[in-house]
Amino acid sequence: DSNTSTITVTVTSVNDVPVAADKSVTTAEDTAVTVTMSATDVESDALTYSIVATPDNGSLGTVSGSDVVYTPNTNYNGSDTFTYKVTDANSGVSNIATVTMTITAVNDAPVTSNGTATTNEDTPVNIALTATDVDGDSLTYSVVTSPSSGSVSIDGSVATYTPSANTNGSDTFTFKVSDGTADSNTSTITVTVTSVNDVPVAA
C-alpha cells in the first residue's frame, strides 16, 4: 500500500441574499399605523429596508430601521398595497415583498351648513337645508332650537318657516341631521322678515 496523502479543500464564503417577507396589516379609516417590515439573513448581516412601490390609496413616511408609517387617504376604506426590498451589508438584495393593507370603514358624522332666507311679513317660506355625508348615508333632519318669532316644520330636507302674525325683522332657528349612527354639528338658519304695510281696518 502507498502512503496516505491529505487533500485540503477551501470553501470560500458566498454571500446569501436576505429574504423579505410579505405582510398583512389592518388599520381603521383615517388612522395611521406603523408597519414593521421583516426579513431574514443567514449571515445575520445588517439590513437596510427600502420602499419599491408606494401605495395607491395612502402615503408612507420615511423608513426608520424596519419601520414605516402608513397613512390612508382621507375617508378611504378598502385594500391597499406597497412593496419593499432589503439590502444586506454585502450589497445582496432580497426579493421584493408585498405589504397588504386592510383599511376598515369608520362612520363619518354628517356636516350641516348655515343658511339664510327672506320672506314677507305674514308669508311662510320654504328653505332647503344643506347637509353632506361622505359615506352617502340617508339623513334625517330635525329642529334643535325653534324660532322666537315664528314656527318651523321640516319635511325631508326642506324647512317651512312661518312668521308670527304681523311680525317683521330677523329670526333664527337651528337644525341638525343624523345618519342613523352619528349626529351632525348644529347649524343656524337666519330668516329676514320684511315689513308689509297693513291696510287700516274701519271701525
Residue locations for each model-derived region?
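C-terminal edge beta-strand
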Residues: 3-12, 24, 91-106, 116, ...
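Conserved structural position at the C-terminal beta-strand
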Residues: 86-88, 177-179
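Surface-exposed or secretory-pathway low-complexity segments enriched in glycine-proline
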Residues: 34-71, 103, 114, 124-162
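Proline-centered linker/hinge motifs at extracellular inter-domain junctions
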Residues: 15-19, 47, 58, 75, ...
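Short, solvent-exposed loop/turn segments enriched in Ser/Thr/Gly
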Residues: 31-36, 77-83, 123-128, 168-174
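Short, surface-exposed loop/turn segments at beta-strand-coil junctions that are enriched for proline
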Residues: 71-77, 162-168
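Short, solvent-exposed loop/edge segments of extracellular or virion-exposed proteins
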Residues: 18-31, 52-56, 110-123, 144-148, ...
